[in-house]
């Protein structure tokens, strides 16, 4: 109601604005007319005056009128724009709700192109988890000194928000590695000049150069370090065709990059590799000639596409996902189906048909009414619909008017070439029942068929047993038994039309059936209507040759484009269907000419690369989520992370709307993913991270190895690179309790007993902590209350220790310094010291082949020429369009 009232108010405001504009215009037009009359009188009275002045006045009046019209137009446009912008959301909602033709095809195309753009990756730097950071040193009283020291720190040292844990930190760290894991490493391409090299040497990448510059500019860097930096340079071996580049890396980063260098995904590239990428069927197609002019040297490399077949089985049990995928395939395929050209003129064809029939006035009127929807656009729509629906294995439905016998005859042709398994069951039954009760049974003098709901057999299967006419019964038998063939080409299942349909011979059966049907008596129909139906059927049978050519054209374009499909084709019913008007089928049959159209080579390779990119991304995301499931299971996060993992996987496939997928399908997807083995590289990377888990924990500024609890306040200790802090790195003389044992047993008596005996204890285990530099918080000793709730609620996950730092950079530091206070605390963070950065021990020599060149988008090196469309031949060696 609110939206309606708002709409009414806006409409009333707009009407009032328009009325005001009209009154203003009328007044100004009247004034202009009066002024024109006065000017005319002046001109007539002063006939001997200057004529040029009168012309200038009239020109000025015309200019004023034009300006006035422009102003009015601008005002109207502005008001229209304001109305549209104010109600834009409401307009979109109404369009989406009530207009069936509203779709998001442009959005699907955009997402498919995003996959294409993300497939080509370039790597300019090495993979890194750590970076050296400069840290200032502090005096024993907490004052900053000019001295500095360098430590290794994590590049991405962030814990997940909310109910976080260290295990989730390692899972997010592993996911970061999976996202940035390189397919290949070309050291020669990413190498940069060492600005301090004495011999114009190079180092491995820009990040190493940044570290050198920061280290060199540090005034505390000693001379022997600067001399060492000037000696860093690459080494080339001409005998082995390799180059070694110095890289400044943390030991874990060095291990990861060495692994990536040894397990690159690139392969040698030759013209043979490119030729093998072309589908065999296209390569041997006589209508296309492929030339590869580029010559590739022995150092050429490429990343092969990841074309493993569907390991999940989206067609089996994932109705929502399968529907989205097939619709995206349908939208994508329609872009590459050629447009029909030089069709017969629609108006001319309708006139010729009416003249040929020579019917009475009432019959001609009925005919023209039935033929009114024939157009070239509708014919093109039907052509793309038939090919696109089979390419994408979409379920189809035909919309028709039962009394329109021309449409029903067109539907008969569609069922002649399209198996019943691709039709929506309800649409198929309605269409067959209309054909039987409107054409077949009245022609043969049989009673109307009464089809019962829930009948397993189709109307055609029931009619086949009752029809005695041989030609009609053979056609019904063909429709009832027609199925797509399944052909396996290079491990991919493709749907294929039968040989009779591919050669167009099936149209002879269709034509014979039409002739037999038109020669029947139609005893129950009036004479005029009977003659109209008979001549319409004869009109279609007269175009047998053109319809046969049309069939060959459809099959050739489909078969050629289907060679570019790289995923198995499964004909499974979809939730939504693609719909076609029967009038469009009539347009296609009546307007088809002898002009042959075949897919352009650029369209073929665009369609091929689009399918390759989708399947490659699909397999990559499967490997990622399987590795993530394995990592979550190993880190004991399996239960709480599962649904989120699967949802993120679906969203990364671009064309699926993850929130709209029912939960039962998501859990079924989880079960399928659990049974897929982990890819080798991803498993090895996880092993490397877990083997260095302690080292990563020490480097992190968010994770400590435990916490010290004491009933008696203890003074803060002095650490050289921090100042005064409550951090200990030695467990001697302290009682140690394992946090994991407390979580398993739930026995908190050891903590309470130790605190009551005034014995400091260390709860050992990796836990997150926060840092606080406020002096007031330390002096108030509020940290004791943090652990009271832990013992009370018996929940160790609430353990969040605070690391206090007090130095000259802290707030209120001079409050402590001037009053000579000694800050104390009852808790201390147990944390190992971070690894100190030493450039002499952090330089690794990475070796790579010297002159590798990686090529992307290999299809651009293929030059394709085609024969003239009129000379194009089908797979039987004959021309596609034989009636030329």
Swiss-Prot record:
Task: Establish whether keyword S-adenosyl-L-methionine is in the entry.
Answer: no
Q: Which UniProt keywords apply?
A: Capsid protein, Inner capsid protein, RNA-binding, T=2 icosahedral capsid protein, Virion
Its localization reads:
Virion
Which InterPro entries does the record match to this protein?
Rotavirus_VP2
Question: What does the subunit section of this Swiss-Prot or TrEMBL entry state?
Answer: Homodecamer; each decamer is made up of two conformers of VP2, called VP2A and VP2B. Interacts with a VP1-VP3 complex. Interacts with the intermediate capsid protein VP6. Interacts with NSP5. Interacts (via N-terminus) with NSP2.
- What is the role of this chain? Inner capsid protein that self-assembles to form an icosahedral capsid with a T=2 symmetry, which consists of 120 copies of VP2, with channels at each of its five-fold vertices. This capsid constitutes the innermost concentric layer of the viral mature particle. It encapsidates the polymerase VP1, the capping enzyme VP3 and the genomic dsRNA, thereby defining the core.
Family, per the entry? Belongs to the rotavirus VP2 family.
Q: What is this protein called?
A: Inner capsid protein VP2
Q: Which organism is it from?
A: Rotavirus C (isolate RVC/Human/United Kingdom/Bristol/1989)
């Amino acid at each position: 109601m609110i939206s309606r009232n708002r709409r009414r108010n806006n409409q009333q405001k707009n009407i009032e604005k328009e009325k005001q504009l009209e009154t203003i215009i009328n007044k100004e037009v009247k004034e202009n007319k009066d002024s024109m009359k006065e000017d005319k009188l002046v001109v007539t009275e002063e006939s001997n005056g200057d004529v040029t002045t009168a012309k200038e006045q009239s020109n000025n009046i015309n200019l004023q009128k034009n300006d006035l019209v422009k102003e009015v137009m601008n005002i109207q446009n502005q008001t229209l724009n304001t109305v549209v912008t104010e109600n834009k959301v409401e307009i979109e909602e109404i369009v989406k709700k009530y207009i069936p033709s509203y779709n998001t095809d442009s959005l699907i195309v955009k997402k498919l192109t995003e996959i294409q753009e993300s497939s080509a990756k370039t790597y300019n730097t090495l993979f890194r988890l750590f970076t050296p950071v400069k840290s200032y040193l502090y005096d024993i009283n907490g004052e900053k000194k000019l001295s500095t020291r360098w430590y290794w720190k994590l590049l991405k040292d962030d814990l997940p928000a909310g109910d976080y844990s260290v295990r989730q930190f390692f899972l997010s760290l592993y996911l970061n590695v999976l996202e940035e894991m390189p397919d290949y490493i070309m050291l020669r391409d990413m190498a940069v000049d060492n600005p301090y090299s004495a011999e114009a040497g190079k180092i491995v990448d820009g990040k190493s150069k940044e570290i050198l510059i920061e280290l060199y500019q540090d005034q505390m860097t000693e001379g022997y370090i600067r001399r060492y930096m000037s000696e860093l340079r690459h080494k080339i071996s001409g005998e082995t065709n390799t180059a070694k580049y110095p890289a400044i890396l943390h030991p874990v980063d060095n291990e990861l990059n060495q692994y990536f260098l040894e397990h690159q995904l690139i392969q040698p590239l030759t013209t043979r590799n490119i030729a093998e990428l072309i589908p065999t069927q296209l390569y041997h197609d006589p209508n296309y000639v492929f030339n590869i002019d580029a010559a590739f040297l022995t150092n050429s490399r490429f990343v092969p596409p990841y074309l493993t077949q569907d390991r999940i089985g989206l067609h089996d049990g994932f109705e929502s996902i399968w529907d989205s995928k097939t619709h995206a395939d349908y939208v994508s395929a329609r872009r590459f189906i050629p447009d029909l050209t030089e069709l017969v003129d629609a108006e001319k064809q309708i006139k010729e048909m009416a003249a040929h029939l020579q019917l009475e006035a009432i019959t001609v009127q009925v005919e023209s009414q039935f033929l009114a929807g024939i157009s070239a656009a509708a014919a093109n729509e039907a052509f793309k619909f038939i090919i696109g629906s089979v390419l994408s294995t979409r379920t189809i439905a035909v919309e028709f008017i039962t009394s329109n016998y021309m449409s029903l005859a067109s539907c008969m042709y569609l069922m002649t070439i399209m198996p019943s398994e691709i039709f929506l069951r309800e649409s198929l039954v309605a269409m067959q029942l209309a054909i039987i009760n409107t054409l077949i049974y009245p022609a043969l003098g049989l009673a109307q068929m009464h089809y019962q709901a829930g009948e397993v057999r189709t109307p055609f299967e029931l009619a086949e047993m009752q029809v005695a006419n041989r030609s009609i019964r053979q056609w019904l038998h063909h429709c009832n038994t027609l199925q797509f063939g399944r052909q396996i080409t290079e491990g991919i299942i493709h749907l294929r039309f039968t040989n009779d349909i591919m050669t167009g011979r099936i149209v002879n059966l269709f034509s014979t059936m039409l002739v037999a049907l038109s020669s029947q008596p139609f005893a129950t129909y009036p004479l005029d209507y009977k003659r109209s139906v008979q001549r319409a059927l004869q009109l279609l049978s007269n175009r047998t040759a053109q319809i046969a050519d049309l069939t060959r054209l459809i099959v050739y374009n489909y078969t050629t484009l289907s060679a570019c499909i790289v995923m198995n084709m499964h004909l499974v019913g979809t939730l939504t269907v693609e719909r076609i008007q029967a009038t469009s089928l009539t347009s296609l049959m009546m307007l088809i000419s002898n002009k042959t159209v075949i897919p352009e080579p650029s369209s073929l390779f665009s369609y091929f690369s689009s399918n390759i990119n989708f399947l490659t991304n699909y397999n990559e995301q499967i490997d990622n989520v399987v590795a993530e499931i394995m990592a979550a299971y190993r880190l004991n996060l399996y239960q709480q992370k599962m649904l989120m993992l699967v949802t993120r996987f679906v969203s990364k496939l671009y064309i699926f709307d993850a929130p709209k997928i029912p939960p039962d399908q998501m859990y079924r997807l989880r079960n399928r993913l659990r049974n897929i083995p982990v890819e080798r590289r991803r498993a090895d990377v996880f092993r490397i991270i877990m083997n260095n888990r302690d080292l990563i924990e020490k480097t992190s500024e968010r994770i400590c190895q435990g916490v010290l609890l004491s009933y008696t306040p203890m003074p803060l200790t002095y650490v050289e690179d921090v100042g005064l802090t409550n951090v200990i790195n030695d467990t001697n003389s302290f009682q140690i309790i394992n946090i994991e044992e407390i979580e398993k047993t739930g026995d908190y008596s050891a903590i309470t007993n130790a605190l009551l005996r005034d014995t400091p204890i260390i709860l050992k285990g990796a836990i997150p902590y926060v840092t606080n530099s406020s002096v007031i918080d330390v002096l108030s000793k509020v940290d004791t209350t943090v652990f009271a709730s832990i013992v009370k609620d018996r929940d160790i996950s609430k353990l969040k220790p605070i690391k206090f730092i007090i130095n000259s950079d802290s707030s209120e530091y001079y409050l402590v310094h001037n009053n000579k206070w000694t800050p104390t605390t009852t808790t201390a963070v147990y944390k190992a010291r971070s690894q100190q950065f030493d450039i002499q021990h952090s330089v690794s020599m990475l070796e790579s082949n010297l002159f590798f060149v990686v090529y992307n988008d290999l299809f651009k090196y293929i030059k394709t020429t085609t024969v003239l469309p009129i000379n194009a031949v089908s797979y039987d060696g004959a021309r596609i369009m034989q009636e030329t």
